């Protein structure tokens, strides 16, 4: 019975991990020498909406002041800590954040429990990194227009997300096989005399 519960929980986890992942869409790719790294103090403008209704729940743009925090240090939701790494000053991204990378099953202010969040983000600055005089947007090699460049950058981000999801799924399958082996080796006999 315990084994069945364990496998059921493992399978539920596997389905949840594969079904819900952080989605990163680069809407304005930028060229720079220094991208955001874990532990950087950053200044970020954003607009947050609920995926289901499109209702805005917060926006730094409305206040006229970007949010300042250390990226990758647990000061913000996990979706931001992971989704805002490797950004250039001036770059814009849209993050689609499932509950597991947001607020989970907790209701926070106008955000209902279990909500998928969508954030339009713009990196305004990185502590200790001079702001460039001119923001140079990135044109993907072979791209004929900015729209095509954005599309190609978004596809590259999606491919990276799929690779991560594939690795997680492989790890879950391996764990399920190991659990099945352990359960198969378990019986009600008080002693094991197989050897």
Curated annotation (Swiss-Prot):
Control of this protein's activity: Inhibited by both FK506 and rapamycin.
GO (cellular component) term, any one: endoplasmic reticulum
Signal peptide start and end residues: 1-19
Domain PPIase FKBP-type intervals: 39-127
SUPFAM superfamilies per the UniProt record, alphabetical: FKBP-like (SSF54534)
Class of the enzyme per the UniProt entry, highest EC level: isomerase
Substrates-to-products reaction catalysed: [protein]-peptidylproline (omega=180) = [protein]-peptidylproline (omega=0)
GO biological process, one term: chaperone-mediated protein folding
Presence of keyword tRNA-binding: no
Keywords: Endoplasmic reticulum, Isomerase, Rotamase, Signal
Motif placement: Prevents secretion from ER: 192-195
EC id: 5.2.1.8
GO molecular function: peptidyl-prolyl cis-trans isomerase activity
PROSITE patterns (UniProt xref): ER_TARGET (PS00014), FKBP_PPIASE (PS50059)
Transmembrane segments: none
Source superkingdom: Eukaryota
Coarse class of the protein's main subcellular location: endoplasmic reticulum
Record bears the keyword Endoplasmic reticulum: yes
Record function comment: PPIases accelerate the folding of proteins. It catalyzes the cis-trans isomerization of proline imidic peptide bonds in oligopeptides.
Membership in a protein family: Belongs to the FKBP-type PPIase family. FKBP2 subfamily.
Protein name according to UniProt: FK506-binding protein 2
Higher taxonomy: Eukaryota, Fungi, Dikarya, Ascomycota, Pezizomycotina
């Amino acid at each position: 019975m315990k084994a069945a519960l364990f496998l059921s929980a493992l399978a539920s986890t596997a389905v949840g991990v594969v079904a819900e992942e952080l989605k990163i869409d680069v809407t304005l790719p930028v060229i720079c020498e220094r991208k955001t790294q874990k532990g950087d103090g950053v200044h970020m403008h954003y607009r947050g909406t609920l995926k289901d209704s499109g209702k805005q729940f917060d926006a730094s743009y409305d206040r006229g002041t970007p949010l300042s925090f250390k990226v990758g240090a647990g000061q913000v939701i996990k979706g931001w800590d992971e989704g805002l790494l490797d950004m250039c000053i001036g770059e814009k991204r849209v993050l689609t954040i499932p509950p597991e990378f947001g607020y989970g099953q907790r209701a926070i202010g106008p955000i209902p429990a279990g909500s998928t969040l969508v954030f339009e983000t713009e990196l305004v600055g990185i502590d200790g990194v001079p702001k460039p005089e001119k923001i140079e947007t990135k044109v993907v090699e072979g791209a004929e227009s900015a729209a095509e460049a954005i599309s190609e950058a978004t596809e590259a981000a999606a491919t990276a997300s799929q690779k991560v999801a594939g690795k997680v799924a492989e790890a879950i399958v391996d764990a399920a096989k190991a659990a099945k082996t352990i359960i198969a080796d378990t019986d009600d006999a008080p002693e094991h005399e197989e050897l």
